[in-house]
């Protein structure tokens, strides 16, 4: 591997490349667009486009694409070449400002939730100059937003950018009251990406992994994660080679891949980046997932990003580390060193607490999916109940403020009032892995997102709801006669009114859901239950207020999320039916036949046949149970076709089909433990999880 600083970002049209290749005036104009959102003149765009093209062609590119993030949660691209015909029958390489700034892919084939009809194909991509263009597979990729002819957002990025502007404006109102000279506030994110690596040859023998991304059948391996020997354990040589290759590719794309390690479950790993501006971090995470999968193929692996690929062991999440900072370098969630900074920190902290409490429903809905339903509340991931962990020390400080008493700590003494907190070291907040939303020293870690989720959705919600509360605070403080008294009262009142959502205990305990209900916290356990929250009037109002989503855009997203849920479970159900009929039941029948023959032969020799007879009886009973469950599932899948309402269909899939699938799996997994290995039609959990060398 070459020297990392030499090649880091070498495939990115970043600031250093812009400085080198653009005229000074053009560079300054582009910087104003990037930093302040100023409109970009078409002449400037032409110069930038030509410089981009020259740089890309020098690096071997022949095509460019507007790279965008439709509501599939994946990325999309349409490749166009740079070639332009000349009069003498040759070609030249051209790329105009218009082609840079705007594209027109067919929008009709992407999920729109009713925003576009199939015959209304026109959709537009618009360049996001704040996210650098990059080279991937010999193509110049230009990060873009994607919208309809009427300006409706058809992607994940557009609402995210809108929400970032909302929190910028709201936070600046608050900072102005504290005399800050900041002119911009940015939301930052560092998404920790978990994933599984399994041998590709074994993966290719499992229809469920291929079609559904997770195992729909499978008895537990004799060993799971109970020895706790995989987490942070020695990384196997083949996996290490994969990780090294992955790092190099990510670094070339300017992605700050920082930490890699084994996770809790066997064959599970994690990659964590250094945090970045939310829209850029979102782009980088989408790229990371894409490159993870592509690189895995090179190394003979399959990278599984499903939230729960294997039953009985941990699934994969994506911890979303969220903070807000100013362009003057101040992290607004970092306790300060002066009384004024402490008061400012407390105001932003209480704003987040109130926002999460007021809008816990849409925060939960933002991470809803069929795959993530398997994780949440399964003693491996946070429960589906939103609560906030602050740690004993910070909670003690807030309690003292509410009670108007002095807070004392063995290490620090704090005066309550304006000068509430000293500098608060990161390690004074414990790590409570059972909390869905935890303060970790200078940021909040939202732990509910699933591993394959685009982080655009939850961060759009976070930015918007915090912006709303900051505006409420600003409205009150701006008209106060005595700012200090009003500030103290606001902080104290907000903490008191929102203490119900602060919980530092064990979120996995049986007692917590009961306690949470007493506190008035929501427990939206499934996607069909959670997603409709987007259309509650208070939520429509807050998104509309900031121009993040129109009501029509929210309705489309609810429709898309529920439709995706239904389609996912339908694919899983049909796959289970197929595997049962073509693989599991025939394998069981063959084993029964061979064991029965063995019993006959043994009897003819006068030998005992207890094992053979008992095995045949046990497997036959399980086959009967499985066959009946198969019939029930098939019949219920047929009923789906008569349901027209998407919400009703999603409820049916959750309440009926999902239960049918569980009933079919139970006897199948028991049969697996009884049938000889050479008879079993696909690799077992032991094969998949423990045989990567």
Go through the PLM ranges and name each one.
Residues 61, 65-69, 282-298, 324, ...:
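Hydrophobic/aromatic-rich, well-ordered segments within soluble, folded domains that form packed cores
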Residues 491, 496-693:
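C-terminal amphipathic alpha-helical interaction region
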Residues 69, 87, 297, 327, ...:
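Hydrophobic alpha-helix feature that most strongly marks membrane-spanning transmembrane helices
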Residues 2-14, 33-35, 151-152, 222-231:
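Gly-rich Lys/Arg/Thr-decorated short loops/hinges at beta-loop-alpha junctions or inter-strand turns
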Residues 121-305, 314-317, 324-559:
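Glycine-rich, acidic/polar active-site loops that bind/position phosphate-bearing ligands
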Residues 73-88, 108, 206, 213, ...:
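Short linear, low-complexity motifs centered on an aromatic residue
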């Amino acid at each position: 591997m070459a020297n990392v600083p030499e090649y880091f970002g070498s495939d990115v049209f970043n600031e250093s490349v812009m400085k080198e290749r653009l005229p000074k005036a053009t560079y300054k104009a582009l910087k104003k667009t990037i930093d302040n959102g100023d409109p970009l003149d078409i002449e400037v765009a032409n110069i930038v486009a030509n410089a981009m093209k020259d740089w890309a062609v020098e690096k071997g590119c022949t095509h460019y694409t507007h790279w965008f993030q439709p509501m599939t949660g994946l990325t999309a691209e349409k490749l166009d070449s740079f070639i332009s015909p000349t009069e003498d029958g040759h070609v030249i390489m051209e790329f105009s400002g218009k082609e840079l700034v705007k594209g027109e892919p067919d929008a009709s084939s992407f999920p729109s939730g009713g925003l576009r009809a199939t015959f209304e194909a026109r959709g537009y991509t618009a360049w996001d100059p704040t996210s650098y263009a990059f080279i991937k597979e010999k193509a110049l990729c230009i990060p873009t937003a994607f919208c309809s002819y009427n300006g409706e957002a058809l992607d994940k990025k557009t609402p995210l950018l809108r929400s970032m502007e909302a929190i910028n404006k709201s936070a600046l109102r608050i900072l102005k009251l504290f005399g800050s000279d900041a002119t911009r506030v940015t939301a930052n994110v560092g998404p920790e990406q978990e994933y599984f690596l399994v041998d590709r040859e074994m993966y290719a023998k499992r229809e469920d992994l291929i079609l559904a991304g997770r195992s729909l059948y499978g008895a537990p391996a004799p060993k799971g994660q109970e020895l706790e020997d995989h987490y942070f354990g020695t990384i196997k040589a083949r996996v290490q080679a994969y990780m090294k290759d992955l790092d190099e590719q990510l670094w070339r794309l300017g992605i700050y891949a920082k930490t890699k390690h084994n996770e809790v479950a066997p064959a599970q790993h994690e990659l964590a980046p250094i945090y970045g501006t939310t829209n850029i971090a979102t782009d980088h995470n989408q790229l990371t997932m894409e490159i993870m999968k592509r690189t895995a193929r090179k190394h003979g692996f399959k990278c599984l990003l499903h939230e729960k690929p294997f039953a009985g062991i941990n699934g994969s999440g994506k911890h979303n580390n969220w903070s807000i900072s100013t362009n003057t370098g101040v992290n607004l969630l970092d306790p300060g060193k002066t009384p004024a900074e402490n008061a400012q920190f407390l105001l932003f902290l209480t704003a987040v607490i109130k926002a999460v409490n007021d809008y816990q429903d849409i925060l939960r809905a933002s991470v809803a999916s069929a795959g993530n339903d398997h994780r949440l509340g399964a003693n491996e991931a946070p429960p589906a109940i939103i609560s906030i962990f602050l740690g004993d020390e910070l909670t003690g400080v807030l309690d003292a403020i509410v009670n108007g008493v002095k807070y004392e700590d063995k290490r620090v003494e704090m005066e309550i009032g304006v000068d509430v907190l000293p500098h608060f070291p990161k390690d004074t907040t414990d790590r409570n892995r059972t909390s869905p939303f935890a303060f970790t020293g200078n940021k909040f870690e939202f732990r509910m997102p699933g591993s394959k989720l685009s982080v655009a959705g939850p961060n759009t919600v976070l930015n918007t709801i915090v912006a709303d509360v900051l505006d409420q605070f600003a409205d009150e403080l701006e008209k106060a006669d005595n700012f200090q008294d009003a500030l103290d009262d606001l902080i104290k009142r907000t903490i008191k009114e929102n203490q119900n959502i602060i919980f530092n205990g064990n979120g996995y305990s049986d007692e917590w859901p009961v306690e949470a209900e007493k506190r008035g916290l929501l427990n939206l356990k499934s996607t069909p239950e959670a997603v409709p929250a987007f259309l509650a009037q208070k939520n429509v109002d807050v998104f509309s207020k900031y121009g993040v989503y129109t009501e029509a855009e929210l309705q489309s997203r609810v429709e898309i999320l529920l439709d995706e849920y239904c389609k996912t479970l339908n694919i899983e159900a049909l796959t289970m039916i197929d595997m049962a009929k073509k693989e599991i039941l025939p394998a069981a029948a063959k084993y029964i036949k061979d064991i029965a023959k063995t019993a006959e032969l043994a009897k003819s020799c006068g030998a005992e046949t207890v094992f053979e007879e008992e095995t045949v009886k046990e497997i036959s009973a399980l086959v009967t149970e499985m066959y009946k469950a198969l019939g029930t599932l098939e019949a219920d899948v047929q009923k789906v076709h008569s349901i027209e309402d998407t919400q009703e269909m999603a409820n049916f899939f959750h309440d009926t089909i999902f239960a049918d699938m569980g009933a079919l799996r139970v006897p199948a997994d028991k049969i697996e433990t009884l049938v000889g290995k050479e008879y079993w039609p696909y690799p077992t959990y032991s094969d998949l999880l423990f045989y990567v060398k």
